Amino acid sequence: MATIFKRVRLLNEQGELIQTDIKVAGGRIVQIAHDLHAEADDEVIDVDGQFVAPGFVDVHVHLREPGGEHKETIATGTLAAAKGGFTTIAAMPNTKPVPDTKQHMEWLVNRIRETAHVRVLPYASITVRQAGKQLVDFVALKEAGAFAFTDDGVGVQSARIMYEAMQQAAALDMPIVAHCEDETLTYKGCVHDGSFAKRYGLSGIPSVCESVHIARDVLLAEATGCHYHVCHISTKQSVRIVREAKQAGIRVTAEVTPHHLLLCDEDIPTLDANFKMNPPLRTKEDQQALIEGLLDGTIDFIATDHAPHTKEEKSEGMVLAPFGIVGLETAFPLLYTHFVEKGICTLKQLVDWLSKKPAETFRIDGGELKVGAKADFVVIDLHTEQAIDPNTFVSKGKNTPFAGWTCKGWPTMTIVAGKIVWQKGRGE
């Protein structure tokens, strides 16, 4: 038995929208053609001319389980991913316990298998308990199912530890993924060291806090040959360092978040902790450098850094509240409305940044719509306008700075391995 998705509109290689049908069987796309004939036992789903994109791939998601289930679970986080059109996500390791041993990783892999709605690739930590002192057993964790290695949530403070981590990762041909933050330069800040911090008398986090770590790690990547990936890049200096590293032939890649592309510290209206994230919103100049870096290929793709927290935690105020915002359910509508519709980028560029590019960067089987590919894709209504309402999120986290923003480009159906895992109006 096969499933035929009729009257889909998808992008061809020239970036033009064409109408066709997609036939799926055995979890793979087996045919893409006009007016496909359905056999008696085939299921037919009429998409009614809506846009179909490859399932989005997000390599930066905090699912909080184990240990933080009051914020999010694998089940709720992956349902939020499905609602946002993401069919593959990578789970960050800042959980309790940290996936820093074979046993912890095996538990996580089994839990994902039992409860996830989409494909989940689990990160292992770089150091034991993410404490930055002792390296994990890289070989054992890879064998247990680790996708890559990161201490995201904190930066690796020791150059020696990072150097030795890159040596081990390079030997296994696996990436080191870095949250870049020199803790001696954070000044215990809660926002960027800029206009907003000065207005409210807050301690600010300077841009150099990030860029000095990237500069260090680029040299370590050059010395080891390791694939080094920069998380949530946020400053113009960081973009310059990554650009120069790529020009020098160093294996460096980088991601940027929707919120750093769409907001700067001038956009923070009040002491609202829904605008508190790490790295913080930077200057307008930094924001423009991020956009330019994405457009010229210095920055490889977009990742959400989905970081759910409870309403109570975010109500503690800008200084005390935890860093982080949610992003899985709003990424595409926000970027389609404010980038594609405003002519900053094309629809094909946006889709590639959310699917093909991260898949290529991390050698993930996905991110493309073609015969033989996994049948992971998303159906999107490009025309209906809708305001972002956190109360409708399926994520446990409602912490977004984009509440009330009106957007187009809302997913209506998400398919993983040929099966519908989320559909608008069904089970919401």
From Swiss-Prot:
The active site is at residue 305. SUPFAM superfamilies: Composite domain of metallo-dependent hydrolases, Metallo-dependent hydrolases. It catalyses: (S)-dihydroorotate + H2O = N-carbamoyl-L-aspartate + H(+). One of its GO terms (cellular component) is cytoplasm. It is an enzyme of class 3 (hydrolase). PROSITE patterns: DIHYDROOROTASE_1, DIHYDROOROTASE_2. CDD domains: DHOase_IIa. Its cofactor is Zn(2+). One of its GO terms (biological process) is 'de novo' UMP biosynthetic process. Zn(2+) 2 binds at residues 152, 179, 232. Binds 2 Zn(2+) ions per subunit. Its EC number is 3.5.2.3. InterPro entries: Amidohydro-rel, DHOase, DHOase/Allantoinase_Hydrolase, Dihydroorotase_CS, Metal-dep_hydrolase_composite, Metal_Hydrolase. Zn(2+) 1 binds at residues 60, 62, 152, 305. PANTHER family: ALLANTOINASE (PTHR43668:SF2). NCBIfam families: PRK09357.1-2, pyrC_multi. Catalyzes the reversible cyclization of carbamoyl aspartate to dihydroorotate. Belongs to the metallo-dependent hydrolases superfamily. DHOase family. Class I DHOase subfamily. This is Dihydroorotase. It comes from Anoxybacillus flavithermus (strain DSM 21510 / WK1). The gene is pyrC.
